[in-house]
From Swiss-Prot:
Its main location: mitochondrion. SUPFAM superfamilies: N-terminal domain of the delta subunit of the F1F0-ATP synthase. Keywords: ATP synthesis, Hydrogen ion transport, Ion transport, Membrane, Mitochondrion, Mitochondrion inner membrane, Transit peptide, Transport. This is ATP synthase subunit 5, mitochondrial. It comes from Eremothecium gossypii (strain ATCC 10895 / CBS 109.51 / FGSC 9923 / NRRL Y-1056) (Yeast). The lineage of its organism: Eukaryota, Fungi, Dikarya, Ascomycota, Saccharomycotina.
Length: 207
């Protein structure tokens, strides 16, 4: 299956009433969207998601494999062997995902595989009514505080009725304190670093 044929399945599926729940951008988003529609017609979205997650974990644990996938000079024959090996080592490999890997190999884009997996997760979360959110803090949020933030966000207009919040805590010491909340394309920056930056800007403008 060529890249054009695989991606065209997205348009064909849309005409049949099957389309991704949200719009994604970039190459990873395009491939993830095409996979979503292909899986919904041929295998299952859940099956494709599990196979991608398994592949992503395998790559993350194997630095050598990651380097091979990222090598743009890898010969076409070797790329095919890599795809076949990954398919054999992945329990319950999904046919639609294997087709995707073949397309990525043909176009020398196997380095996009983990990115596609991440974008596909966004689609499945949206399909299942999950809203992804990230709260960035200088130190890890303790259980009780994390649940308080989670509850406050879940009840906010950011999430919406009938949706379920999927919250992740990202630690970045450089924000110095406070927190940064990101939900979809919306960001609320309450970090100390941001406040200092704004103060410095005001001081510069007043001099």
């Amino acid at each position: 299956m060529s890249s054009r044929v695989f991606v065209r399945s997205l348009a064909a599926a849309a005409k049949a009433g099957v389309k991704p729940p949200i719009q994604l951008f970039g190459l990873e988003g395009t491939y993830a969207s095409a996979l979503f529609t292909a899986a919904s017609k041929t295998t299952s979205i859940e099956s494709a998601g599990k196979a991608l997650a398994s592949l992503s974990k395998t790559i993350a644990k194997d630095a050598k494999l990651g380097a091979i996938l990222a090598n743009p000079a890898l010969p076409a024959g070797d790329r095919t062997v890599v795809v076949q090996t990954l398919a054999q080592k992945t329990p319950g490999m999904d046919a639609a995902v294997q087709n995707l890997m073949q397309v990525l190999a043909e176009n020398n884009r196997l380095n996009l595989l983990q990115g596609v997996a991440g974008e596909f997760t966004k689609l499945t979360d949206a399909h299942n009514g999950l809203v992804q959110a990230t709260v960035t803090t200088a130190q890890p949020l303790e259980g009780k505080l994390f649940r308080r933030v989670e509850k406050a966000l879940a009840q906010s207009s950011f999430i919406g009725a009938g949706k379920t919040l999927k919250l992740e805590n990202v630690v970045k010491p450089e924000i110095q304190g406070g927190l940064i909340v990101e939900v979809a394309d919306r960001t609320v920056d309450l970090s100390i670093a941001s406040r200092i930056s704004k103060l410095n800007q005001v001081l510069k403008e007043s001099i």
